[in-house]
């Protein structure tokens, strides 16, 4: 018998480095990487039933109802790649009601990784971000400055990358996370995200490796 595949949820505030870690996890563990936002865009582009319904809400400037998104997530998790190789659910659920909807469908992860980065570092990471309108490349004034003066002179800041906007986004994020804690409290693992990319991944890798080991032991003992 094959071991039960890995099922992982990951969450992190804006600029916590979650996107980078997801890429590393996906590459090493071959998990189906599922982001609700990407799913939503794909379904809308494909003109599916869920996509059409979601689009109606978005065009009115309203939030897409939980049931539509949960449906999309459920259908995606039923695809063969997610069933066979396991899955990485990225930045979802975001609220207690979304978590409950997944629980009702018996969709439960082995672990819920919470990337923990101090607020002042998150703010610094976001506020220092700059966009090169010519190439679309993202720079950071401190961590990855532009190669030359010419590029430096044309860099722009995205309108929602201001300190005020970041702090609002963080506030919303923390409220959302707070509401999830009760559902996942015994499987939440906080990983300090203020180290280097490799150091953060080493901790995640160790965690996922030990979960897989336990799953394999269970198979060999039955």
UniProtKB/Swiss-Prot annotation:
Catalysed conversion reaction: AMP + ATP = 2 ADP
This protein's record includes keyword Chloroplast: yes
Subcellular location: Plastid, Chloroplast
Example GO molecular function: adenylate kinase activity
Enzyme Commission numbers on file: 2.7.4.3
PROSITE patterns attached to this UniProt entry: ADENYLATE_KINASE
Keywords attached to this entry: ATP-binding, Chloroplast, Kinase, Nucleotide-binding, Plastid, Transferase
InterPro entries on file: Adenyl_kin_sub, Adenylat/UMP-CMP_kin, Adenylat_kinase_CS, P-loop_NTPase
Database matches in SUPFAM superfamilies: P-loop containing nucleoside triphosphate hydrolases (SSF52540)
Annotated AMP binding sites: 41, 62-64, 91-94, 98, 158
Ranges for region NMP: 35-64
GO CC annotation terms, alphabetical: chloroplast; cytoplasm
Transmembrane segments: none
Major localization listed first in the record, in broad terms: plastid
Residues covered by region (LID): 128-161
Residues that, per the record, bind ATP: 15-20, 129, 195
Transferase listed as a keyword: yes
Subunit structure: Monomer.
Role, per record: Catalyzes the reversible transfer of the terminal phosphate group between ATP and AMP. Plays an important role in cellular energy homeostasis and in adenine nucleotide metabolism. The maize enzyme also works with CMP, albeit with 10% of the activity with AMP.
Similarity comment text for this entry: Belongs to the adenylate kinase family.
Identification of the protein by name: Adenylate kinase, chloroplastic
Taxonomic source organism: Zea mays (Maize)
Gene name as annotated: ADK1
């Amino acid at each position: 018998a094959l071991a039960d595949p890995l099922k992982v949820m990951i969450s992190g505030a804006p600029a916590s480095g979650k996107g980078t870690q997801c890429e590393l996890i996906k590459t090493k563990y071959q998990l189906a990487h599922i982001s609700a936002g990407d799913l939503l865009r794909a379904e809308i582009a494909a003109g599916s039933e869920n996509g059409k319904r979601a689009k109606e809400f978005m065009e009115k400037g309203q939030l897409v109802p939980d049931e539509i998104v949960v449906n999309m997530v459920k259908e995606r998790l039923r695809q063969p790649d997610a069933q066979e190789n396991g899955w990485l659910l990225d930045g979802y659920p975001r609220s207690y009601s979304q978590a409950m909807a997944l629980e009702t469908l018996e969709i439960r992860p082995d672990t819920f990784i919470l990337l923990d980065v101090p607020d002042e570092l998150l703010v610094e990471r976001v506020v220092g971000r700059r966009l090169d309108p010519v190439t679309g490349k993202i720079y950071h004034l401190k961590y990855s400055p532009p190669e030359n003066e010419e590029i430096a002179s044309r860099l722009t800041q995205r309108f929602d990358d201001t300190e005020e906007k970041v702090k609002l986004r963080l506030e919303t994020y923390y409220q959302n996370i707070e509401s999830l804690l009760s559902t996942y409290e015994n499987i939440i693992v906080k990983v300090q995200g203020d180290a280097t990319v490799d150091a953060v991944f080493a901790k995640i890798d160790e965690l996922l490796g030990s979960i897989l080991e336990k799953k394999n032991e269970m198979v060999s003992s039955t």
